[in-house]
């Protein structure tokens, strides 16, 4: 029989009992001034944070690995762990150790996860931090994706009958955590990047009945109609999962969330994650942020709220002319007046993150420093307002042909001023209450100014003037009692006392109480001395306790102002967003585009804003571009490195900027509003999921062909290059034909290709128009002119580009020989007008190594009339077809073909 293990200490028993409830989190266990971690948690944390790993003995036989971090610096350590994808459970002492009988009671007060943090140390100031939830109802063939930023209280979502569309939005919004019902797998097509998937029980988190109650309770409504959730049970379930997870991690029901706003796709230009990546809106193609992205060019915001609004507008530009033109009016008004704009920037620079400050205050997670930041922000509001009310300065204006002059306030700004709230009452309260440099922790005291609270003033006076009070009492007793030789003393045993010589002790008044007799002296106390002593000894503790109570009261009062603070935060965010667009336009010489509801796109001297910023405006070559009913698909040819991809990207970016309401990098621009922008540019693969570069290219092309409409803008770069020459050319040719047939006249498309044979489609298919990037041959070299000119390119100059890239001379020379032979073969075949010939390449004469090349011939023209079955097959979306729907469609197709069972019998 084995001996039982020695009993664990009470502390370790408590630790293990709490840890059992949080097996997937690192448990930060509060012990005095430190958070300690034990066992596997300690080893993991020590490794990830590069801190010392020690050990502690839970009993006589066991040694437990241990590490710890000081409580006053814990935020920085937790931030590192969250960035690495860990969850952290914070276990606090929930009773005062001085009053505890035995082991101090402890409990987990919150669980920190990447998608639920609200502290600045764990957040990027100008980026949203989303928690997402995706739910698909297989029976109803419908689903939803919802997301929330806990730090600001904003949340939204969308309902769809296409599962693929929901996953596209999950990729686009890139939540830090994505909640999925247990048993649901991530599809192979989804590339979630840094998003962590979290499986949660469907019954508890995604349940419709309890979820409906949870959503209505959190939003304070009696029905779902006011939230836009009526008749969308799948979206209700996704929202409910978010709320359940937040309650589970935050250990409280969150009531700070703003009213839920479903995303109205009909109001916004849709840009999927692939297009955002290809256009390098937020990240470069190598995944890094900063220089090389459109965000880096546009971000001249000064407040975190303005930065996040800029991010939102880049994700979701407008599709309606009204909001676009309103934004343009304000941007132009600020663009005109440099003095006003700089004054506005100076005032906005004093404003902190009002949204996140308000959230932390409301959730009782704010530090004294947060209140100081709020005070400074509110104090800046009058200065911001004054910049809008001041008359225009003629010396600082920039003349334009604007519809708004410097003295005419655009309607969005006049509406803003009419509703402006300086929050002067709360700014005054915070000025009167708090010192300029309060401590970081509420429990340390020293928070409040003198004069804010009479009781606190008395305690502060005692702490500061206690010795003087004692001397005043001594002088009073000396005078009133007639004891001029009376002295005041102190020791740790008796505290404060009066002392007289043995000879003078006989004449003390009756209110003197003897405390101690010495050889040559007597020591006394009085009621007043005891009262003063008690006040002095307890003044520090009483002051800290009172200040903590006053701070909580102040927090509750300021929390009531959250709706007003958020209202002004939204105003400041828009002002910051508008001035940022104006400042960027002024600095870079951008112009206000004409945005209309037609389909034409006309750009004069357009530029790529990112490339121009990196190269310098002097060396960047601008280009003109026109798309209309006769030029709906532009075939762009030219050599590598000539600038085809730049032209494609800059056109898409100019359209995106225009629909944000921003100015654009061009001399002049007229943009027909698009409903979606699609981009298939550059090579990429997904090897982890078994998808080659060509497979990814075809999947993205398929999505474009399924989803693009007549109002869409499509940019395609070198479709078909990842396979054999003829396969690739055939695919590219077929894609061009399909794009010109779609949507009753074709889809607006920029199509860059090296398959020069496709340029023969101009004149054969309406709407196809050839353009090329011009080059010049000079003394055996090629000079890239970077100019987009009419007509097709005569050749690709790939060998010359290879030579410029440093490919060895022998390889370049051999390539020239092979090219010359291939061209002779092609020309001979065309000259004899015979059947396609085959020619063995020179130098490859071994039978087993022969490569044969067919002469390129134009494919047959497509028939003017398609069979109805072909039309039905082409338009079907197999990704979202159910088995029942498939059977129904097959029956329809058989009828179209004329081979029903009845016909065969």
Curated annotation (Swiss-Prot):
Domain of life assignment:
Bacteria
Q: Which GO terms describe its molecular function?
A: ATP binding; ATP-dependent DNA damage sensor activity; damaged DNA binding; mismatched DNA binding
Keyword terms of this UniProt record: ATP-binding, DNA damage, DNA repair, DNA-binding, Nucleotide-binding
**Is the keyword DNA repair assigned to this protein?**
yes
List, alphabetically, the PROSITE patterns matched. DNA_MISMATCH_REPAIR_2
Question: Listed GO cellular component terms?
Answer: cytosol
Q: Where is the composition biased (Polar residues)?
A: 831-840
Presence of the UniProt keyword DNA-binding in the record: yes
Question: In its UniProt record, which GO terms are filed under biological process?
Answer: mismatch repair
PANTHER family cross-referenced by the UniProt entry: DNA MISMATCH REPAIR PROTEIN MSH1, MITOCHONDRIAL (PTHR11361:SF34), DNA MISMATCH REPAIR PROTEIN MUTS FAMILY MEMBER (PTHR11361)
Q: What is this protein called?
A: DNA mismatch repair protein MutS
Name its species: Nitratidesulfovibrio vulgaris (strain DP4)
Gene this chain is encoded by:
mutS
